[in-house]
């Protein structure tokens, strides 16, 4: 219907901001125990259980990146 390249730039920025916000919520390090419970019994869950510190560090980095991009998207920066 509406291709992303045909949307005006001011419409595209909030959409990307919401996507970065969703990623920030999912990768928040405080959600790591919930993520471990959801992934229990899977290969990702086994990796998470064995490498708790690495997972926390990676999720923290991704969380900081997502929050930074979220703030830039809603402030109108690039």
UniProtKB/Swiss-Prot annotation:
UniProt keyword Transmembrane present: yes
InterPro entries xref list: MerE
Localization: Cell inner membrane
Membrane disposition: Multi-pass membrane protein
UniProt keyword annotations, A-Z: Cell inner membrane, Cell membrane, Membrane, Mercuric resistance, Plasmid, Transmembrane, Transmembrane helix, Transport
Cellular component terms per the entry's GO annotation: plasma membrane
An MF annotation (GO) of this entry: mercury ion transmembrane transporter activity
Pfam families: MerE
Transmembrane segments: 19-39, 47-67
Role of this protein: Broad mercury transporter that mediates the transport of both CH(3)Hg(I) and Hg(II) across the membrane.
Protein name: Broad mercury transporter MerE
Originating species: Shigella flexneri
Gene: merE
């Amino acid at each position: 219907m509406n291709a992303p390249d045909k949307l005006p730039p001011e419409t595209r920025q909030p959409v990307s901001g919401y996507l970065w916000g969703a990623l920030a919520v999912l990768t928040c390090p405080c959600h790591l125990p919930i993520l471990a419970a959801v992934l229990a019994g899977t290969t990702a869950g086994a990796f998470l259980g064995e490498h708790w510190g690495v997972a926390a560090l990676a999720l923290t980095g991704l969380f900081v990146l997502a929050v930074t991009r979220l703030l830039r998207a809603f402030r109108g920066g690039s």
